[in-house]
Amino acid sequence: MFHVFTGQPVDRLPAQPICMTFAARTAGVDYYSYVTDYRVLVDAQVRTAERFDLDIVTLCSDPCREAADCGAPVRWFPDQPPAHDPRDPLIKEKRDLGRLQQPDPYSGGRMYDRVKGAALLKEKVGGDLPILGWIEGPMAEAADLRGMNEIMLDLIDDPAFVHDLFAFIVEMELNFARAQIDAGIDIIGIGDAAASLVGPDLYHTLIFPYQQQMVDILHAMDCPVRLHICGNATHLLADMGRLGVEMVDIDAPVDLRLARERMGPDVAILGNIHPVQYLLEGTPEDVFEGLAICHEQVGDRYIVGPGCEVPPLSPPENVRAVVDYAKATAVTPHPRPLSHSGERGDTHAL
């Protein structure tokens, strides 16, 4: 993975799909247990990585850790990620922001559960598999604390409040990141899906500077960054490329050739077969050939995986096909990998 980031030769491309609900299902545990007990999450991640020969284990599980530790109510479900109630945000009135205290990631709350997960993963697979930590981006966390509808209106009506809220969020997320880094993660993801709902001008003016601040400080902590903005982020690609992150997840609605063109040659790109169409409803051959097309569109510095999370009911053979494609890119005298059926592909040059 790190050689891909720097453009160095690799023996094969890494396979790094995001497995959350799929990992819980693979391990035979309910998702509530997965997100509330770091030991369950770690066991499921290690089992899934071993069963499918993945090149990553991840602490990403749900978007409710930071806001929950701030005091936000959480809705819990047995077999899907928890969520905040948009009808009951923590910051109902703007003045509520002034009453919030920075949560301590070591205080025993949901953030600390992730930190302990990082330490346990380091103990179990450190040095063998890269460990992906996770924090929320400024817009995503603002939606968790304030509510999506309210923060979207705030962007227009009260940018000064948005700046204050984003400043609070960045401090909180960087404290959370520091704790995960100290516990042993190798790379950190920033999830900011809500940013894809914002137009390019507002994004550039209000969101991009805070994402940039996060990336710069994470780099000062000597931690590579993986940016995850799912949805259609086509209108944000140029700015996303300017952030200087090592890796970007590109979701299915985005044209990969355009992503490479606008973000430049130096960032690693993961994606972007549609998780439902290919992994849940497709065949292993569909997955393999879809990834070959994605690889051809991205070119160098490609990381193998779907555009977003692996659906929990995906057939195991389809997830194996993701890894099969990554393994087929091993350096050989032949310029093209074997197709999943075992025949040389004629149209998917590496």
Q: Which functions belong to the PLM regions below?
A:
Residues 45-75:
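Glycine-rich, N-terminal phosphate-binding loop and its surrounding beta-alpha-beta segment
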Residues 341-345:
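A cross-taxon signal for low-complexity, glycine/charged-rich
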Residues 1-23, 29-34, 44, 55, ...:
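Active-site loop segments of alpha/beta catalytic cores
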Residues 92-102:
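Acidic/polar active-site rim loop that often engages polyanionic ligands
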Residues 39-42:
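Loop-to-helix transition at the N-terminal end of transmembrane alpha-helices
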